Amino acid sequence: MVIMVDKYEALQDLMRRRGFVWSSFEIYGGARGFYDYGPLGAIIKRKIEKKIREAFIREGFFEIETPDITPEEVFIASGHVDKFVDPLTECKKCGSRFRADHIVEEVLGIDTEGLSAEHLTQLIREHDIKCPECGGELADVWYFNLMFETYIGPYKDKKGYLRPETAQGIFVNFKRLNNFARNQLPFGVFQIGKAYRNEISPRQGMLRLREFSQAEVEIFFDPKQKEHPHFEEVKDEVLRFYPIENQLKNLGMIELTLDEAVKKGYVMNTFFAYYMAMVKRILLDIGIPANKIRFRQQLPEERAHYSSDTWDVEIHSERFGWIECVGIAYRGNYDLSRHVKESGADLTVMIHYKEPKIIKKLKISLNMKRVGPKLKGDAKRINQKLQEMTQEELKKIFEGLEKIGKVFLDGYELEKEDFIIKEVEEKVHGEKLVPHVLEPSFGIDRPFYLLLENSIVMDEDSRVYLKIKKDMAPIEVAVLPLVAKEPLTSIAYEIFRTLQKEGFIVVYDEKDTVGRRYARYDEIGTPYCVTIDNQTPEDNTVTIRDRDTREQIRVKIEELPEKLRELIFG
């Protein structure tokens, strides 16, 4: 336990002191839930984003970029205005506010996931739970919307929100994106950007932020075509699963190939399974150890309002336990259907049949001679409405007429005789459908922190350094003259400039002893130091020192860029 605390504190110190991450607005006392990326942290963050971006571009996906500020109508349609909430309570004495479920969970040691505000209030009263700040009485629990509210323009009649997810920017653009994809399913679209959640009480440092970065991928597909064409390439990939059944029975994780997971019913289909493999491979490519990754199926009460099945991809932290870093959610057609309903836009895809089909269709219209005098000017409008109804809507009218002999339509009571009902046969060449969506959603900040936590090494000789995956290092090469004297400095600087032009992230450093400089660059994860010593002017060679082994090899200067490229990028 002591080693764990020391490691955590050493990492916090390293991140602040060496320019990875620090609290935002420090000179004004800071603000909880906000962090700034320093020069080294920003490089690693961009490298994580690059790994994700390149992986999905290789799959043939499209990237877009949409605004952070979004009109209220979008989030009314998506359900976020009503459902993106957390339970909140307030101390009646000191006015402090807290996540009610967190307080109850900490005091009673129970799982509060999915408990209603009323149930949480009941537990607070039954167990006389008090304010953790002053011991005062807590108010009844209510729901607090986590979106940051704002206004678009100078007037308050146009409400907006900072987006809580990047996904909606993709969904509202579906019509244009579908045209870009030439009306062919499946296709994928991703967006990397900021999202915002006004967390009630952000805790655990970088793991719970009010402003954070996401990479969300929306894969649109025909729900009748749930098999991925390239599943054979990944079916033998072994993943660690923690399905619902094992959680409820305390059975622990199981290791299965993706093929086994699909056949045993843990994963719904090969389409879902393929992207599980892809997510795992991206995390490995970032540098997360395989034994620190697991796939945990969310319990029904944990799922977001739009999800019918979600697997969280979690990374293990020595200090915080298993941390959700990626969510893979089956969103069905929830989002697109909601936007169709609220906006009236046509967000369907035309699926063409291989051969035309003959289908039976119900057609209902008004018997204008009979209803004309009764409906008067509304008859034409109601008849047009009937022509625009879906088959499902027409079937409901037909069933109502068959059961009780009448229906109510736009305020009028109409009998079966008021309609002309026909069943006709039509030759159709395809059908329109609202696509379903599978969403892998990556956090960026959590994998960033957990990459560093899993990379920090504390040697027995008190050496602290980042054993980060070599191509993820913020500084890839340090060029060091053995001493700050000519001709070593001139040669070293020329090598530094050459490596810059070759595309390496490289620094030149001639200050302090070479031992101190090695330690300085080991600490921030620089995988290789190139040293120009007294032998260099004689034979045009330099040493390359390995961060992890501290061993050195000599290479000719002209071979240096290619050798470093091989060592760092493989």
Curated annotation (Swiss-Prot):
Subcellular location: Cytoplasm
GO biological process, one term: glycyl-tRNA aminoacylation
Entry keyword set: Aminoacyl-tRNA synthetase, ATP-binding, Cytoplasm, Ligase, Nucleotide-binding, Protein biosynthesis
InterPro entries tied to this protein: aa-tRNA-synt_IIb, aa-tRNA-synth_II, aa-tRNA-synth_II/BPL/LPL, Anticodon-bd, Anticodon-bd_dom_sf, Gly-tRNA_synthase/POLG2, Gly_tRNA_ligase_arc, GlyRS-like_core
Protein name: Glycine--tRNA ligase
Residues reported in the UniProt entry to bind substrate: 99, 165, 212-216, 439-443
Organism annotation: Thermococcus sibiricus (strain DSM 12597 / MM 739)
One annotated Gene Ontology cellular component of this protein: cytoplasm
High-level lineage: Archaea, Methanobacteriati, Methanobacteriota, Thermococci, Thermococcales
Single GO molecular function: ATP binding
Biological role: Catalyzes the attachment of glycine to tRNA(Gly).
Gene3D superfamilies listed in its UniProt record: 3.30.40.230, 3.30.720.200, Anticodon-binding domain (3.40.50.800), Bira Bifunctional Protein, Domain 2 (3.30.930.10)
Binding site for ATP: 197-199, 207-212, 324-325, 443-446
